[in-house]
Amino acid sequence: MSKLNIKGIVKRCDDYGKLVNRYCGPVFVGFATSLITLIAITYFTIIFPATSDFSNLFFIFNFFCDLSISLFLTYGIYFNYIKAIITKPGYPNLNSTLINNINSNINNSNNNKDKDKILIIDNVKWSYCKKCSKAKPPRCHHCSVCDKCVLKMDHHCPWIGGCVGFYNYRYFFLFLSYLWVSVCYVLAHSLPLLFGGYLYSKKYTEIDRLLVIISSIGSFITFVAVGSFGGFHAYLIGSGQTSIENLYPPKKRPNYSLTSIKDNFQIVLGKGDYWFSGLLPINYTPIGNGCDFKLNISNEDNNKNNENNENNENNEIDNHNNNNNNNNNNNNNEKEDNINENDNLISYDTDEYNRHKK
């Protein structure tokens, strides 16, 4: 029997996964949109009216405040989700004459080592993408699903049918944020109905109860999944990282973090007249061109100093161990010499004894 080609099987499965991810993107988008719409319709037609009270002016005022918040959150979800889907993540500017000249020179080179060199373009270190056969700026990575290099690529998301990158990352993160707050709002209104017995009155049908149960379960799953995923991305934004950069070993991880967490959030969400300006569901163009990113030199120097200190400590330990080994070797040599001398003495004494005996 022939041996199984494990690498070939893994590669084939990976290729099939990429095809599914590439061509089934609309299916994931349609499923997510349908689930969000189902929860929204159930909330506004069943859950929200059941929890409203018009007995006095205070409850009437509370009703309009509650309705305004609900409508605003719903608008924030759909706006950011649509913008995350239709906004391109950003690709390297291949129309530049300078970059085209560099690409042609590299492609014409017969030496493969030239393609591994770092390119300096406008005082920025660019690398070379072997799959695209073109130059790419820092933090730009090649997406195997889209088959393109993406500026400041974070990851390929099937739920938006494309990559999350420089130009649509803000919309993606705000979509997660608005969605998580919204499902919290839905659960806060639906749980009293489920456990308070209101749904079992004659006022509601079996379909109403089923819709509320499905919406509550979907909201709870979204609460856990989106909460953990959104919290991870909040950490990435606050530390100036992307999902890909977070996978690097700490010592090899480039540090693009700014002076404070606030600055890191503002560079992604935007800065306005108010503290909440970056959270508003509005059109926004990120700061910069997606190619030029400044490293935090102070932290890089600290990391290098720490590495140098560790290397120095390791060298001192090695030197100490070598000295101990040398001392041990010298001691062993001295012992061997003493043993040889003793052997000679013993043999000499034995000869002398034999002579006297004769």
UniProtKB/Swiss-Prot annotation:
Sugar-modified residues: N255, N296
Lipoprotein is among the record's keywords: yes
Broad enzyme group: transferase
Keywords: Acyltransferase, Glycoprotein, Lipoprotein, Membrane, Palmitate, Transferase, Transmembrane, Transmembrane helix
EC number in record: 2.3.1.225
Alphabetical list of InterPro entries matching this protein: Palmitoyltrfase_DHHC, PFA4/ZDH16/20/ERF2-like
Gene Ontology MF terms in the entry: protein-cysteine S-palmitoyltransferase activity
Name of protein: Putative ZDHHC-type palmitoyltransferase 4
Species in which this protein is naturally found: Dictyostelium discoideum (Social amoeba)
